[in-house]
Swiss-Prot record:
Belongs to the SEDS family. FtsW subfamily. Peptidoglycan polymerase that is essential for cell division. One of its GO terms (molecular function) is lipid-linked peptidoglycan transporter activity. Its EC number is 2.4.99.28. Residues 1-27, 88-93, 142-155, 198, 299-322, 375-394 are cytoplasmic. The gene is ftsW. The keyword Nucleotide-binding does not apply. This is Probable peptidoglycan glycosyltransferase FtsW. It is a multi-pass membrane protein.
Amino acid sequence: MEFLQNIKKNYDEWTRITPQGLLYDRALFWLFVILLLIGLVAVTSASIPYSSRLFNDPFYFAKRDAIYVLLSLLTCYISLQISSSQWEKWHAKIFLFSVILLLLVPFIGTSVNGAKRWISLGILNFQPAEFAKLALTCFLASYFTRRYDEVRSRHVSIFKPFIVMLVLGCFLLLQPDLGSTVVLFIIMSGMLFIVGAKILQFVGLIALGGILFVWLVLTASYRLKRFIGFLEPFKEPYGTGFQLTNSLIAFGRGEITGEGLGNSIQKLDYLPEAHTDFIMAIIGEEFGFIGILIVILLLGLLIFRAMKIGRESLMLEQRFRGFFALGIGFWIFFQGFVNLGMALGMLPTKGLTFPLVSYGGSSIIIMSATIGILLRIDHENRLFRIGQARLRDD
């Protein structure tokens, strides 16, 4: 009850202080909603054959995805109520909670396709790796705010964020989940670049990350086979290159305008994970190059808004808000880039979803939380500018 009263109090305060036209970033909100709806339509189409075969219900995954979309909107609204100062205050607790969740996975986790990465919560299999991305972004935003001058000047300070990232990464690699570990590394690297770490240190850190990545690929036979399959997918079209060859066939069939909604052939048990990791291949087949271009444009605009909000925060000397928003922007960009690159054969296949579009409750809900955070940061920036303007007028 107290929580609902706080929501009403905050809303009344916003509407009293801020003109209606300045409540929130409408462009960001509608980009978010449109991508969710595109994802719902695409998942419904892509999952019908798979749902029919497994559950004798063609809309099994579609109904679950619709529930995830509703939960995502609720999550976005709840995260919108939390001030950036609260996120900054809770950064250590959020990070610790993320570590605890990752520690629980080997003991109470649910195995899917041979990997134990999820914790069953009834209707939702929650993936702690998704929460870890948010936890790391929040933690580093607070760390860089507190140690801003130190990170820019001292040589060893750049490796402290790396150690923090490595803690989460080690737990993820036990699942195993190299893809999410790489996302954590990119979030950390992107934020270090924005903070202004010395270029030689930054390059050295990237080189260290690259060496570790190569070592992890070479020391795991299944990763090495997947990498070889990525280099020559048509050499073993029914083996290591099976997913990639069928993904490329889907894009090829779509051509410019696509085969039409529901007319995909590759989703008929030819392309594994059609409604999750390879949703963009089905969109390419059914809506063609134009459909893919529209989705990329929408996500690109959303990322641009995130970066713009981060930049405005830094210009207002609100470093935590700025680093948090920019970290989220790097996260969304890299995950979308890797998923699309994987589907197009530009990158090795990894279990990363396309933001807000692919089927996956954990990914959609956590991504929606980040949108709520961005909307809140943008709103606080607007209030801050209004306050500055009033001071100048006085």
